[in-house]
Regions:
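Acidic-aromatic/histidine active-site loop/patch
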Residues: 106
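Catalytic nucleophile loop
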Residues: 109
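A glycine/threonine-rich phosphate-anchoring loop and its flanking beta-alpha core
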Residues: 8, 17, 23, 114-149
Length: 149
């Protein structure tokens, strides 16, 4: 069973889905069909979760799916920590119609949100928060940030 909450903001509306086993049962087709997708996965997220997501996305006929696994900590939540994400997007010629997916906790959702907001002046983003704090804070509300010190 899942619940959907529609969030309305001045810059645009979005949907928050809440439930268990959504990755394996959600119909992603309207979001991913014929699109390039980059999943940025926190290294602490079990590979089984990534595979469930990858299978579900593949059933929705994307153009391609790439995965980048990153180490997350307050040190990597920086400009330098973002470089590998930008490099994968650029090396694979991801365009403005691509989709970025953040799979992990609050640091991951902050980093991926920052990249989505700045790559090619903004690309589509799906956040899949995997910790309680990221589910109630970091992945919701449209805020994102990195450390600069």
């Amino acid at each position: 069973m899942s619940k959907s909450i529609n969030v309305r903001t001045p810059s645009g509306d979005y949907e928050v889905l809440i439930g268990s086993k959504l990755l394996g049962s959600y119909n992603f087709k309207w979001l991913v069909q014929n699109r390039q997708i980059l999943i940025v996965k926190d290294s602490m997220v079990p590979n089984e979760i990534l595979e469930t997501l990858r299978i579900s996305l593949s059933n929705s006929q994307p153009m391609e799916i790439k995965v980048l696994e990153i180490e997350t900590n307050e040190k990597t939540k920086s400009f330098e920590g973002l470089i590998p994400i930008f490099e994968v997007l650029n090396a694979n010629k991801f365009n403005r119609d691509c989709l970025l997916i953040g799979l992990g906790g609050g640091i991951t959702t902050d980093m991926v949100g920052f990249v989505a907001a700045s790559y090619l002046r903004g690309i589509d983003l799906i956040q899949i928060p995997t910790t309680l704090l990221s589910q109630v804070d970091a992945a919701i509300g449209g805020k994102t940030g990195i450390n600069f010190a």
